[in-house]
Amino acid sequence: MLRLDSSDDKQHLVIRSAGGRGKAAEYSFGIEEEYFLADRRSLDVAIQTPNELFESANWSTGGQAMREMLQSQLEVATNVHVDVNDAREELRFLRREVANVAAQYGFVIMACGTHPTAVWRMSQPSPKPRYEEMIEDLRSIGHRNMMCGMHVHVQLPDPEKRMAVMRAMLPHLPLFIALSASSPFWNSHKTGLKGYRLAAYSELPRTGLPELFESRHDYDEYVGALQRSGVIPDESHIWWAMRPSMKHPTLELRAPDTCTFVDDAVAIASLYRCLTRHLYRRPHLSKTVTVVERAIAVENKWRAQRYGTDCIFASKDGPITISELLSRLIDDIVEDADALNCAAEVEHCRTIVERGSSAEFQLRAYRENGNDIAAVSRWIAASTISGRALRSDAPRLRRHSARASFGNDNGIPEFAVSRAVSWRKA
């Protein structure tokens, strides 16, 4: 069991074992995934969803499933983990549990950045005061927020070094966007982008890449100004691609699309975790990120959205392929991957580049089925539950493939009752 506690110097929050016998391993992490709820027969996105579904899902997962801003969305959050294999197994468990509950109400879950055929104008806010207030403020832009992302929290106790890591991490954010791209369709149209989600998400205020804050004080001053001006109630309304958590001693990656494959989600989370460790131990690297590097990162964010795993990034030295960029990064963090026992997961990022992210599979399903967008939805629904790529290329799909993939395995893995802390809505 894990719990939040104070550090030995009483200056920071840390994760400790429930027995109090010392800190858990540094750089513990958690993963949040958002899913679409869709009609089990038509795979059209759900418009209205009953509270009982979410109550059942919350109970079934031990409190790890909840509503999101729109009724068509459901979010799960893992517990805090120090072992990457535990995190993988919990994600699989959470998908199985919420899928089984959703099926009882006539729905399936779909893990992707955008639903291929969803019509945002029909979206309805979830019946919670927080979300109703957000829709009242955001209006049409809030209704257009029909998209799903993956968030990764990594524990970094020192708030000053946490801000240094956020700044140093900024040039790397486009890589996470490219690796996770799973949103090539919007409103039944092929967008031409591999990751359309962030293009739509950028309509919201306080999104995109973080600013170049020099210190935690500067960040707090910015947040305080918005709060005193009545712009935001708290810093959870800052929706950058990465942000410090409001409630926990973590730095939260928010850039990725929800991954269709569990192994891809765990690989991207592991890459981020290793890089945070690397940068946390070298806070001076934040000073190398200037306005020029940020401007290049903004361009590369667009390129990652447009091209996904086919991306060629811009750099001061000229173009660099995603394969070369990833290889350099893996070389830099090899010590960190060994220390965190996730070298295999980091290496899986190379597999994502070689065979493509979910966006490539979706586009293949579309082409191989005569440009039938319904085939894309069937592929996503089936692959969400299997959680893995069944072949190196997207299979030809039949109408029954999603339905045939739903199992009845309700086994609860040991970790589901052996963790006590999770990072949600922070």
From Swiss-Prot:
InterPro entries membership: GCL_type2/YbdK_subfam, GCS2, Gln_synth/guanido_kin_cat_dom, YbdK
Domain of life: Bacteria
GO biological process: modified amino acid biosynthetic process
Gene3D superfamilies: 3.30.590.20
Gene Ontology MF: a single term: ATP binding
Presence of keyword Lipoprotein: no
Catalytic reactions of this protein: L-cysteine + L-glutamate + ATP = gamma-L-glutamyl-L-cysteine + ADP + phosphate + H(+)
NCBIfam families: gshA_cyan_rel, PRK13515.1
Function: ATP-dependent carboxylate-amine ligase which exhibits weak glutamate--cysteine ligase activity.
Family: Belongs to the glutamate--cysteine ligase type 2 family. YbdK subfamily.
Name under which the protein is recorded: Putative glutamate--cysteine ligase 2
Organism: Bradyrhizobium diazoefficiens (strain JCM 10833 / BCRC 13528 / IAM 13628 / NBRC 14792 / USDA 110)
